[in-house]
Amino acid sequence: MLSGNAALKKHKGAMVLPAVALYRALTASGADAVDLLNAYGDAMGRRFAGIVHCITSVPGVSGLIWRHVDSFMDRMSGENLGYQRRIVSEPPEMFGVDILSCPYHELARKLGNEKAVLCICRMDKAYMQGFYRIRYERTTAVSEGAECCDYRLRFDPEKK
């Protein structure tokens, strides 16, 4: 299940295994694991969004990120991390990528607890809102049963 290179194993395991363990423990105790983990994902995502905003609001940082958005997205969701994706548009107007297969979702599914990773998706969606001058949208997610996660990023000088 955690096959592949050591970096990929560490990346997938560090994110998925704690979520699956919490999901199983909460379910065993009779708690609504999905709601609790999703609330945690939302809260942590908002917290990370604040950190992301502080960093990216430093003058020049958001422009630098946008000029290298393709490299940035490679580091966050590249094939070297186990994602399968399709680039649908490139800057300057928009950077769009469809994630067709997510290593987090695949590992959780193999472990029999695919709903455990919904909290990671929610955290991701919340913290990506923190980017200064970069507008982020995602309307679908593989973990929610969709064909893809539809990431769309646009540079927006008016977004604070």
Regions found by a protein language model. Give the residues of each.
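A general boundary/transition motif marking the beginning of the first structured unit of a protein
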Residues: K10, G60-V61, A116
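N-terminal leader/targeting and assembly helices and adjacent pre-domain segments
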Residues: M1-H11, M15
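C-terminal non-catalytic interaction appendages of large macromolecular assemblies
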Residues: E93-G96, P103-K160
